[in-house]
UniProtKB/Swiss-Prot annotation:
SUPFAM superfamilies assigned: Quinoprotein alcohol dehydrogenase-like
InterPro entries for the chain: Apc4-like_WD40_dom, Quinoprotein_ADH-like_sf, WD40/YVTN_repeat-like_dom_sf, WD40_repeat_CS, WD40_rpt
One GO CC term on file: outer membrane-bounded periplasmic space
PROSITE patterns hit by this protein: WD_REPEATS_1 (PS00678), WD_REPEATS_2 (PS50082), WD_REPEATS_REGION (PS50294)
Pfam families: ANAPC4_WD40, WD40
Organism, scientific name: Synechocystis sp. (strain ATCC 27184 / PCC 6803 / Kazusa)
WD repeat copies, ranges: 59-98, 142-182, 185-226, 229-267, 270-309, 312-347
Protein name, per record: Uncharacterized WD repeat-containing protein sll1491
Repeat as UniProt keyword: yes
Keywords linked to the UniProt accession: Repeat, WD repeat
Amino acid sequence: MNNYFPRLKQFSAPATFFLTVACLVYPGENAHANASTPNPYTVAQTTASPSVAVENLSGFQGIITALNITPDGKYLAVATADNQITLIDLANQEVVYSQRSPVNNFADLAISADGQWLAIAADNNVDVRRVRDGMRVETLVGHTDKVSGVAFSPDGETIVSVSGGDRTIRIWERASGNLIQTLADNLGPTTSVVFTPDGSQFITGAIGQDRTIKFWDANTFELLGTSPQQPGFINGLAVTPDGRKLVGAVRNFVKAWNLADAKELFSVRGPSLEINTIAVSPNNRWVATANKEGTIMIFDLANGKQVTTLRGHQGWVLSLAFSPDGNTLYSGAEDKTVKIWDLSALAR
């Protein structure tokens, strides 16, 4: 298979428990929190501006392993290490439900584009639930090792799951829970998966000795292309809402490619430790990365320039999600909190 990025169809994409103001942080690579003040109501010490306000969403009893926002921006879904699935009404700041799951080891959480379904990577399975009440409708059984990543097709009819342990990609029919196909030939430990916005392809990333990005036809499941081997583990992938760019977390680098011609747009060194996860804002402005240092870095999607570093979490930051307008970022971490970052000032 040739190393290339297949040409994609281009289109225009259609056009925020307990809340406490925690701190202010500022753009600039050297921004840092005031370490001498243990009080959470602090202001970062820096001369840069404008400010980025952050709120704490606390009350969780387990590490935040995955989170996501419904497409309408009304609800936040949170998966925690104590096997709880929690849905929060963001407008009313109320918990809609918090349910204990019989499965654990939550690794990823996807929400369908119509906002009706949750798919949760848990143990060797994928738990499919209704968003509105948390009712489990299907358990997708077939993987023989921990499921690392999960994604809905844009029409919500197909779920793709990947496991770095069993080195398979599995495609499921959402409505019936039936396994459509298993992809296992010549695969490395695949841990991330994302669909293109037009639904024509899904893209996977691998760790281990493989360290390649693979492109798959979402209808025939044919392998369309494989990238050159990357210099580090591919810990996360995201496609911009306009379908033009692929962004990846490769070790501690943020990389972006033009999907039309495979041209690398930028490769930027981020934190000193590995990046855990990556997210692209729906307004095509920002790339957010979270790392093992407990910090979040925001990059300009146009040129890869670092815009700001967000500090405040204690421990690894494991999950990120943007609001639909791209002005708010949600982060979940080992410290059992979700932080809500107001990025609107960055665009001024």
